[in-house]
């Protein structure tokens, strides 16, 4: 067993999963629904979302057609979710695009279209969800991320830059609201390379990764604020030389938490 403790309040609440038409987002929506969570599944393909809803346990997945890159449409979509299902208590920012284009051949407008979804969508959805969460002082946000900012590959400048900015945003949100709303817990999760359209055939099955992601998303603990998990374990922060020496003298060392 891992360290994650599932929050009953989150289980009984309303979760929003973006990019839920296929791949990891679909698997996360189905995993949460299987655990009893009411899920608003956001995506651009209405037919695809309806297929996801048809697969879900107990009719708990509700399709919401939305392009998160259309930032102005996001508040209205979240208002509709609140009216129909109830206030959002959990948001998983998963939606992303990964166009493979050489920067010298790419139109800057296409570059910024990638940023609009991968970063702008996270900003808009997080803001809309937080407007509801601050009313009760409770909530959970999980941002799906990658190491693309530190290990970019060729022909992926837009993806790498936007996902890297998303990583900074996670920490910036905690810095901005963490002291005022400590029970709105914001974390980052890197599921690794998956066997999805954006991943590689030899990658991890999305359903396996989604089991970890759902557990992390439903784990509500103040100590998770600003923390990063990779696959099924916590990524420990680098320690200074002084910290390492003190830990050695005290015969203790940090232990990564597991999902």
Which residue ranges define each predicted feature?
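Conserved glycine-rich cofactor-binding loop
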Residues: 21-22
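Residue(s) in the substrate-gating loop at a strand-loop-helix junction
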Residues: 146
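The beta1-alpha1 cofactor-binding region of Rossmann-like NAD(H)/NADP(H)-dependent oxidoreductases
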Residues: 47, 65-76, 108
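C-terminal helical subdomain
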Residues: 180, 184, 188-189, 196, ...
């Amino acid at each position: 067993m891992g360290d994650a403790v599932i929050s009953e309040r989150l289980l009984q609440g309303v979760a929003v999963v973006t990019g839920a038409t296929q791949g990891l987002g679909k698997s996360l929506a189905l995993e949460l629904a299987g655990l009893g969570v009411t899920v608003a599944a956001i995506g651009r393909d209405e037919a695809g979302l309806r297929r996801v809803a048809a697969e879900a346990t107990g009719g708990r997945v509700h399709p919401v057609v939305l392009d998160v890159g259309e930032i102005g449409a996001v508040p209205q979509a979240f208002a509709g979710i609140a009216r129909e299902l109830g206030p959002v208590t959990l948001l998983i920012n998963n939606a992303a695009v990964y166009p493979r284009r050489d920067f010298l051949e790419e139109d800057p407008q296409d570059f910024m279209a990638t940023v609009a979804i991968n970063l702008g969508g996270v900003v808009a959805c997080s803001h809309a969800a937080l407007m509801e969460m601050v009313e009760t002082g409770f909530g959970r946000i999980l941002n799906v991320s990658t190491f693309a900012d530190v290990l970019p590959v060729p022909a992926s400048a837009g993806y790498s830059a936007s996902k890297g900015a998303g990583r900074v945003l996670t920490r910036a949100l905690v810095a901005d609201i963490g002291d005022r709303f400590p029970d709105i817990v914001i974390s980052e999760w890197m599921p690794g390379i998956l066997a999805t359209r954006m991943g590689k055939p030899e990658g991890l099955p999305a359903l396996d990764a989604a089991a970890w992601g759902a557990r992390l998303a439903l784990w509500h603990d103040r100590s998770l604020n600003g923390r990063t998990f990779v696959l099924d374990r916590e990524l420990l922060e680098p320690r200074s030389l002084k910290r390492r020496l003190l830990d050695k003298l005290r015969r203790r060392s940090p232990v990564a938490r597991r999902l």
